[in-house]
């Protein structure tokens, strides 16, 4: 059985790890980095992922996609998506099923399809390290991800050629990574996870009993649209507004300029975690009739903190809710673990320390902990790790719409999963022959204020007065947090069930098509790589042959020389084309035409040998004479 890898599919960066013996190990990518930017770029010739995509973003802003995780499993009409439409340089569009998709070069693409490109890079990184194919993975998601977002993440894995063995929550994964190194008996930890696009807070109880560790999530809360991207956007807006005040030019209309500002803002934000001030210097950012304009502005740490303080405060609200749900006070938290790159900001660290009354742990790598935890869970599922038990929870309450437009909850939030719960309902009218089961996720009393996950009908109910039929509704949540709902008429035994895929999401047929497209692209990529290798081989042979012709000199007959040069020219011409077989044929033709050159080379080598032997004899005489001269002195 192959290894089950752990992947942290992040908004800004992604990371892959695997169990190496009994220890989890983060794997470096082809560029030598331990994390990979979650950036995908589509050019005329190829799809770029990670650092290569990031490098060309300034010149290709409309086809360079980032923070796609903020769109995954979301409806186009969601307020968060509408906010992103205003600030993203690429085009967010409405899919036929109402989902938020992206338009690239006139083609509509689903977020899982785009995220699959990052997962494919993670898969390849692991395969290069392990030296064997990888087909299974544990992928992490924010704890507060909805069912639709979890389904979409699984779909992305499937498109990338991975069987997703488990979806686990990011804070839980981070706690797994922390718990491996912690030998304390029993403790309660708070994982504060502020990443590139999402925020989670989980309260986790870690029990050590006879060498076995149990990780039980007591409560979780969060905001799936709060993260480093929002911090960046505050600084971007400030830079753009200051430039407009000074120069009278609005850079928001220039996507290339905005991409430069975005990069500079991200860099400045990172620098201000260690410095008190930094200079943003973007020469020739734009030009008007008066000439070129430069953006030069000093940003202090205090200014950045003033711009984002409300965002940090916003992150503390879910912390309060999670503590209340867990029935714990701040003083009962033994350790606070910071996860996600944005937690490197001193203001975030200070606010968290002030809230909990203790300094957060600094010995957990915020960029790698989640992937490490995912790898540990992969080890558990593969049977390689036997002393760890993970008990996660469902982040939001689940129920159905009942009479009067009310949500009746069947499974409360923070219930340990997997779980199953049934409840009996009845009809609202006399002789009602069918009921619609409308499945909801959320905490509000009014059904319409919660997220609709889908609906289905149970038909064929025998005519009876209202309130008489017995309809049993069952919710079943698996270990991935994915939901199945069934309704059964207890009188007739008729049953109807659905695996929730929300009213949106990708159909099986669409996923299969995307898998086929991905496989076709992989085949095209392989063929392109082989073509490049053949071209390089052709170039090396042509260069080597020309060099040999020059060295052969008069040892090569003019007629032979002309034939070989003709074969070299034919090969160089073929190498500029796209036909690998033609290049290979021309290489073969050149090798055949070069036979006289090989003979000339051998003749020249023999000649050289004879000259060397003669020279050695001569050298002996000279040495003797030299010695005699030396003696005379």
UniProtKB/Swiss-Prot annotation:
Low complexity bias locations: 600-614
PROSITE patterns noted in UniProt: HSP70_1, HSP70_2, HSP70_3
SUPFAM superfamilies per record: Actin-like ATPase domain (SSF53067), Heat shock protein 70kD (HSP70), peptide-binding domain (SSF100920)
Region of interest called Disordered, as start-end residue ranges on this chain: 600-633
InterPro entries listed in its UniProt record: ATPase_NBD, Chaperone_DnaK, Heat_shock_70_CS, HSP70_C_sf, HSP70_peptide-bd_sf, Hsp_70_fam
Residues carrying Phosphothreonine: 198
Induction info: By stress conditions e.g. heat shock.
Pfam families linked to this entry: HSP70 (PF00012)
KW Hydrolase (keyword) present: no
Keywords, comma-separated and alphabetical: ATP-binding, Chaperone, Nucleotide-binding, Phosphoprotein, Stress response
Molecular-function GO term, any one: ATP binding
Record function comment: Acts as a chaperone.
HAMAP family: DnaK (MF_00332)
Family: Belongs to the heat shock protein 70 family.
Name of the molecule in the record: Chaperone protein DnaK
